[in-house]
Amino acid sequence: MKWLLCINNKDYPASLEVMKLYKQLDDPTAEQLGMVRIIDESGEDYLYANSLFIQVPTVFGNYIDMALSV
């Protein structure tokens, strides 16, 4: 699973928290448009600009997945 770190919540303060990790859902069409699909604070999945996040390196994402599965 891919994880993203929010680095900017401008225009979305109720939906995104800066410095919070979000699960990236697979959406190839969104990626072609420079967007990412995540589950935000509402608990629903929405599209956001890719520029609001940085991708967590896979090795750290694997550790996050393992920690959450315990």
List PLM regions with ranges.
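C-terminal structural segments of small proteins and small subunits
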Residues: 47-70
